[in-house]
Structures are given as C-alpha cells and as structure tokens.
C-alpha cells in the first residue's frame, strides 16, 4: 500500500459531528496538523468525507 501525507487546512469549527469524528480518526485536530497513513479503502472513504478540509499528497 502507498503512504500518503494528510494535512488539515480548514478548521473543524461549524462542521458536522461526523466530519469532526472523521478528522479525529485520521489523527488530525488542528489546522496545519499532518499525519502519514497507508492508503487503504477505509482511509480513502474517510478522505472522501472530509476532502474539503484536508490536502492529500503522495
């Protein structure tokens, strides 16, 4: 599996509870926080839910 770097670029304030939980599951919480994750189908699904809040790079 490929590793991707996920960076949160938009605040979670005034976002739905589901989107906040997805960000927490990814290991994000504050603006400009970054994590590296394996690109599994479950991570892809989470990224689809919060694609307007994060930037994904290879």
Swiss-Prot record:
It comes from the Bacteria. InterPro entries: Ribo_uL30_ferredoxin-like_sf, Ribosomal_uL30_bac-type, Ribosomal_uL30_CS, Ribosomal_uL30_ferredoxin-like. One of its GO terms (biological process) is translation. It comes from Cytophaga hutchinsonii (strain ATCC 33406 / DSM 1761 / CIP 103989 / NBRC 15051 / NCIMB 9469 / D465). PROSITE patterns: RIBOSOMAL_L30. One of its GO terms (molecular function) is structural constituent of ribosome. Belongs to the universal ribosomal protein uL30 family. Pfam families: Ribosomal_L30. NCBIfam families: rpmD_bact. Part of the 50S ribosomal subunit. Keywords: Ribonucleoprotein, Ribosomal protein. GO terms for cellular component: cytosolic large ribosomal subunit. This is Large ribosomal subunit protein uL30. The keyword Ribosomal protein applies.
């Amino acid at each position: 599996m490929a590793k991707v770097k996920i960076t949160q670029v938009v605040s979670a304030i005034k976002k739905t509870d589901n989107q906040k939980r997805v960000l927490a599951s990814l290991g994000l919480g504050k603006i400009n926080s970054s994590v590296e994750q394996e690109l599994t189908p479950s991570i892809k699904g989470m990224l689809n839910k919060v694609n307007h809040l994060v930037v994904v790079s290879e």
